[in-house]
């Protein structure tokens, strides 16, 4: 009979993703942003973190983690299709609000030895998501 010991296994993809989001969230809070929603999902889209900047701007954050810089690293892994899914989810989220605040799309790119916060990483118009 084969046995499996979780203590020697690597964390699941979902667990690694949650750890990356925790790390990104902690960094953004240190920069003065406050969490609004985590893992917002709708049909066809998802947002890892929705934060509020000190000036009231709503910040939609995509968190990307890579084990190395191959293929351009974490930031390069955000394809136009992924941007469209984030924008779609952001539009869905904004439709639930009584008043739409200023918004932006940021990326937190995590690699083993660094964290990079890319503010205004992309915009809704350039992402090409339909209304």
UniProtKB/Swiss-Prot annotation:
Superkingdom of this entry's organism?
Bacteria
The record's listing under InterPro entries reads:
Restrct_endonuc-II-like (IPR011335), tRNA_endonuc-like_dom_sf (IPR011856), UPF0102_YraN-like (IPR003509)
Q: Which residues form a coiled coil?
A: none
Instruction: Please name the GO terms that the record assigns under molecular function.
Output: nucleic acid binding
Please give one Pfam family short name: UPF0102
What does UniProt give as the signal peptide span?
none
Listed Polar residues bias regions? 1-12
**Region Disordered, residue ranges:** 1-21
NCBIfam families annotated for this entry?
PRK12497.1-3, YraN family protein
Which family does the similarity line name?
Belongs to the UPF0102 family.
Task: Please give the name of this protein.
Answer: UPF0102 protein RALTA_A3032
